Amino acid sequence: MRKLRNTLAAISILFLASCGGNKDYYMFTSFHEPANEGLRYLYSEDGMHWDSVPGVWLKPELGQHQLMRDPSMVRTPDGTYHLVWTTSWKGDLGFGYAYSKDLIHWSEQQMIPVMANEPTTVNVWAPEIFYDDEAEQFMVVWASCVPGRFEKGIEEEKNNHRLYYITTKDFKTISETKLLYDPGFSSIDATIIKRAKNDYVMVLKDNTRPERNLKVAFADSLTGPYSPASQPFTESFVEGLSLIHI
């Protein structure tokens, strides 16, 4: 959630969408700093060469700062697009949610108060949405800092993040918030993909100094337990990852 170096770093999830005619395109969601303008799209025919779709497609209305950072989207089997995003740097106890049938016209925006039972929570950062095709429900994972909750590392208490999650079928009734992953260090920007049945991969950012790099963990179940985090597979100062299973 530090200032992003480039547009690609702002990606929260890569998804495949049909963009008219009979041709399929890769698309991803993005945003521009200072993140108060709203949702943007980029598209590609091959997943390697990208161009922007002009315009802002959803202006943020929620939260203390009314931001749209880290937009993450998934398409369900019925063709509906479901979007979640970060609404504020600090102070909000939830993330934003909206849905659309065509990526143009969006539902009313809702705040999903996932940390309402933890009033000392500093933030709710980078929610990532995953559709569980086996359970036919959504899972959203995000990073929050609850001061004093975990052993203090080299980061200050208000920057000591861990990864949490909820599940829901409709974003009207949500599960109890649970801890997804404690790797023993401050971590953010987790994204999960399913490689096969009982085979899940989670990539996350080690948000401690001087690391600030990406690591990977594995699990037999979507909700874990996940393996210890790997050694970094990127240079330092990398975040905002995107994954797609090809």
Show the residue positions of the predicted features:
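Bacterial N-terminal signal peptides that target proteins for export
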Residues: M1-L8
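Bacterial N-terminal signal peptides
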Residues: A9-F15
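Carbohydrate-active catalytic/glycan-binding domains of CAZyme proteins
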Residues: S18-H245
